Amino acid sequence: MGKTLYEKVYEAHVAVAAEGETPILYIDRHLVHEVTSPQAFDGLREKGRQVRQVSKTFATMDHNVSTTTKDINASGEMARIQMETLIKNCQEFGVTLYDINHKYQGIVHVMGPELGITLPGMTIVCGDSHTATHGAFGSLAFGIGTSEVEHVLATQTLKQARAKTMKIEVQGKVADGITAKDIVLAIIGKTTAAGGTGYVVEFCGEAITDLSMEGRMTVCNMAIELGAKAGLIAPDKTTFDYIKGRKFAPTGADWDAAVEYWKTLKTDEDAKFDAVVTLNAADIKPQVTWGTNPGQVIAVDEPIPAPESFSDPVEKASAEKALAYMGLEAGKSLSEYKVDKVFVGSCTNSRIEDMRAAAVVAKGRKVASHVQALIVPGSEQVKAQAEAEGLDVIFKEAGFEWRLPGCSMCLAMNNDRLGPHERCASTSNRNFEGRQGRDGRTHLVSPAMAAAAAIAGHFVDIRDWK
């Protein structure tokens, strides 16, 4: 019987498979940031161990860096300590670090792909739940805990049981104005936020292969939001064209050999998945979350659902709680509610394509007077590219704040956050209670939808904007 893409990558990395034991996988790339690494390095130090493969380990600062200044003190004492500790640890253990003053600094899941650190067929881990982003390249990428970070630093391996497999196929082409973010939110709306639990997902279908690499990264980034361990997309010419010429990409004969191997990284026709989910791309409309998990999502032209519309008692109770927290009334349109803040950024939507999409909407318009709108590029490289294209000028003239790279308002670990009951149109990946600030209300949308909400002062259907 044939094998799935996941099975091919998984099996190629089994280093030890003792009977009755969880297999040990070799890890090709380990990405490190300031929040989940301090205790891991302390563990190495206490046990007298070194980092086994420094050439496969890359660190950056992203979670709590300020987006208004390069001052390491700007986000508070805890943030300063974490960043100073990362500098010390990387110096001591010989790990490459792109700190806040480096031209390659950025959100770890933006920085890795744009430098060619992320390549098809690799195993990639990071102490961060959205590591699945890198699966857009046909790599097996997933988040790990701090004790596992230490284990990978010390051994370049990790115990990892084989997951179940799920195929999510988005058939046909999407309508104009429908983005990767809309696709993945529609998927999660169908599967629910727990539908992928225990699975590694492969995204496929014409609507997926039509996406750019930036779009594919958006989709895989949110695989974790449907409960999956990881999400993969088979590499193709789009993938190879994106990688070629990047800093850590193979060159010459090595490139030719790599591409030949990468072309084998696809699910065999006779492979069997444990579960299959199918969506019709033409049915997908601009999506907006209304609740407190990404599965609580509707098309922008649909009314806010009533709890009674859910047959499952758990979903019904969750909907009641979410509506109360979000300050929403069932049956109303989301466009009836004012937004207070808008955030375009995060490892989901902070790449150059996302900046361009928001700029198209912003150009020649003005942010509503009651709205604070932040544009936070995902890396120094994205920021430089956007500025070379004049996007920063478009944003600033429209009344958006053009910020420095970092995770920013996605998780409120710096000073970018919501106040109590403030409503935010956000391009990030999680709308949990308090995620963007205590009692803050988060609605997940695409960059174009977020920019339009900033200008209108409330949610609008981007398809009506010309």
Swiss-Prot record:
Binding site for [4Fe-4S] cluster: C347, C407, C410
Enzyme Commission designation: 4.2.1.33
InterPro entries membership: 3-IsopropMal_deHydase_lsu, Acnase/IPM_dHydase_lsu_aba_1/3, Acoase/IPM_deHydtase_lsu_aba, Aconitase_4Fe-4S_BS, Aconitase_4Fe-4S_dom, IPM_dehydratase_rel_enz, IPMI_cat
Entry similarity comment: Belongs to the aconitase/IPM isomerase family. LeuC type 1 subfamily.
Cofactor(s) it depends on: [4Fe-4S] cluster
GO biological process, one term: L-leucine biosynthetic process
Catalytic reaction equation(s): (2R,3S)-3-isopropylmalate = (2S)-2-isopropylmalate
Pathway: Amino-acid biosynthesis; L-leucine biosynthesis; L-leucine from 3-methyl-2-oxobutanoate: step 2/4
Biological role stated in the UniProt entry: Catalyzes the isomerization between 2-isopropylmalate and 3-isopropylmalate, via the formation of 2-isopropylmaleate.
A Gene Ontology molecular function term of the record: 4 iron, 4 sulfur cluster binding
Any Pfam family hit: Aconitase
Note accompanying the cofactor annotation: Binds 1 [4Fe-4S] cluster per subunit.
Subunit composition and interactions: Heterodimer of LeuC and LeuD.
Gene3D superfamilies hit by this protein: Aconitase, domain 3 (3.30.499.10)
Keyword check for Transferase: no
Name under which the protein is recorded: 3-isopropylmalate dehydratase large subunit
Spans through the membrane: none
Keywords from the named record: 4Fe-4S, Amino-acid biosynthesis, Branched-chain amino acid biosynthesis, Iron, Iron-sulfur, Leucine biosynthesis, Lyase, Metal-binding
